[in-house]
Amino acid sequence: GGRVVFGIGAGWVAAESAVLGVPFAERGAMTDEHLEAMQELWTNPAPSFSGKYTQFSGLKFEPKPVQKPHPPIWVGGHSKAALRRTVQFGAAWHPINRSPEELRAGQAELARLSQARGRAVPPAITLRNDVRIVGPGQAVPASTHGGRVIAGEPARLIEQISELAECGVEHLVLEFLSEDGRELDEQMAAFAERV
């Protein structure tokens, strides 16, 4: 037990918010409030909460998480609001496809925000990144999320991942870019064997 990570992001696609009937401009405030509500549910034996978007009382929320006080929260995004949210609520900042330069800048901002908030230890840095093993002369596919793709021959991937570790990335969540299931299996097997 105790291996759950709670990942959350405010979202960045306005059309998704529209389908759900959620005002896109309020997504950050809603995310903050929902994080407060989740912490109340996780930690209080008789939880109650009264906010703009969420209200509850007189309920039982069981079982409580194995991790205390609650599962680690990884906050997605790379905006200033996401960094602020990470310092306020998160155990880790979890952006997608960021370059080493962007990660270093984010790390510096997390340290600044943590100090301003009186947080002794800044959040960890985790990263979700697209990855693709390619041979000489092969094109690197574009990411559906934009940003940097970890790509190249296995030795080049090792260099890129090492550079991310030097930037403070503690966990790397990979999404293999592939055309189909067969190619996905090949990419993952090659990565496991050679990277």
Could you tell me what each predicted segment is?
Residues G1-V195:
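Active-site-adjacent structural elements that line small-molecule/cofactor binding pockets in enzymes
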